[in-house]
Amino acid sequence: MIQGVNEQRPTKCDAALARCGLSYPKVSIDRAEPLMTRSHAVALNLFKTKSPDLLMAEAAAPERQLKRTLGALDLTAIGIGAIIGAGIFALTGTAAAGQVFSSRLETPVINFIQAWLSGGSVVFGRAGAGPAIAVSFIVAGIACGFAALCYAELASMIPVSGSAYTYSYATLGEIVAWIIGWDLILEYAVGNMAVAVGWSGYFVQLCDSLFHLRFPLWLVNDHQTATSLLAKGGDALEGYSSTTLPVIAGHSIAINLPALLIVGAVTAILVYGIRESARANTMIVIIKVAVVVFVIAFGAFMVNPTNWHPFAPNGFAGVMSGAAIVFFAFIGFDAVSTTAEETRNPQRDMPIGIIASLIICTLLYVLMSSILTGIKIYTVYTGDAAAVATAFASKPWARALVSAGALAGTTSVILVFQLGQPRIFMAMARDGLLPQYFARIHPRFRTPHITTIWTGVVVGGVAMVTNIGDLADLTNIGTLFAFILVCLGVNVLRRVAPERPRPFRVPFVPVFPILGVILCIALMLSLPVMTWIRFFVWLGIGLTIYFLYSVRHSKLRRGVDAGITEDVPPPFIKT
């Protein structure tokens, strides 16, 4: 049976709750209960939720407060900074011309499902959209829009750093929150490692194109990449000032120094302050949007309308296949929600930043893809990861322009993702799921400096010595999984707390969130088999850490053991 128990000493969190007119209900589990009953209670506690009021009250504690300086324009720039990376230059050609896979592990799961349903053989490829790639971008933007609307509602209701992790804690329970918090490492930290390596490549290209400045092979590549290039020889080694690897203690050495330096520089800015970080991001966003607009405006005069015929050579299947590819050019808008505690008016500005950034990027993508397929017939882009350079091949400045745009694009992605990851770690540490050390706020700068520095060290260090390009798809599947839980969270919170004020409301609930879930699952199935295998391995590692560490240190769980529990039951338990 449940009965009142021990009085607890007041804590700083208790004081913050009292200021908001809230308190922890005092309950405990009778130690004389049968073991099965107590085990059942422990199992239920895995899905125990935190009320939005409690989450906001905990964040309002003076020692935890971040500096609120961001407005709607800053948030929109953060969203654009995260969304538009090198993908706009790399994915457009692939989606228009189609894709061929070399093995079963590289083939999307959906291809195997289609073969099983039709009784035919597995197709090792995806049809291209052709000039209808513009429609593919619209379809992908709409699919992303369902998730964006859900993020906007939850971000305005629960303006707390932590993004999908926090929303899952409020709607689906602690273990689901841990899973999504662990999963988001794939989007932010692992994704940033890959982006930093890509940034290094564009930096080297730009230095060569503009200043004829070349670097030694060993200084701008990790060891695996350097030895691979040496094995290829010939043109693969063109562009380096030296191809000899230094030897220390009998081992050849190669490091990607530019990748480390860009992560280090961004980390320093983020530690110094959110206002300075937002300003730096806005300037970078202006540069990369200007490059995209220039390419669109200049390319419009080179368009040959006959290249747009046939418009959809592979019909509806080609359009949807293209949408599955280009969807991943939209990933990143959710990073806006990690800055909720640093926004002056989060209830109003968070939805504006999330939705406005997605609309602007969709418009730019549609125009860019239309121009590229109008300049050259879409089949030219088969297997081409540099579609813009190919389209402007007759222009000597094309390579430098693409490198400059991609460099600006990846710089802002690194900045925004490095901004987002520490705030998720901070939110998890507040709840006891990570060491409290990670929840510390710098007394002067009011930034989560400990987690920011640690994230920078890990991301920069790994990017310096390893090329994790093969793991880039993990970012995609991790992000889609987060989108699914956020969409589910909207429906859950509408059911368990229908009376709560919602500054922004998703229209047509539960239809829109359900459509978001369905489309995200479909897009997850468009990812390779190997990505799914790696994803489940990653989740397995995360659950192991949860049960070995986080369960024993969870503040919610320790509250139950000490006579303190939450006032919100698991969402599947009717009260």
Give the residues covered by each predicted segment.
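Membrane-interface "cap" regions at the ends of multi-pass membrane proteins
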Residues: I29, L35-G130, G145, L149, ...
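Hydrophobic, membrane-embedded alpha-helices of multi-pass small-molecule transporters
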Residues: L70-F89, T94, S136-V139, H251-I269, ...
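Membrane-helix boundary/coupling elements in multi-pass transport proteins
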Residues: F89, F146, V160, D183-G201, ...
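Extracellular loop-to-transmembrane helix junctions
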Residues: A90-A231, S242, S357-I360, F535-W538, ...
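TM-loop-TM module centered on a large, flexible mid-protein loop between adjacent transmembrane helices
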Residues: S103-R126, T166-Y167, G173, Q205-Q224, ...
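Membrane-interface loop-to-helix entry segments
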Residues: G198-S200, A254-M302, P313-F316, I354-L358, ...
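Hydrophobic alpha-helical segments of multi-pass membrane transport proteins
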Residues: Q205, V292-V295, F425, T475-R502, ...
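C-terminal membrane-solvent junction of multi-pass transporters and transport-like membrane proteins
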Residues: H251-A254, V266, P313, Y437-H449, ...
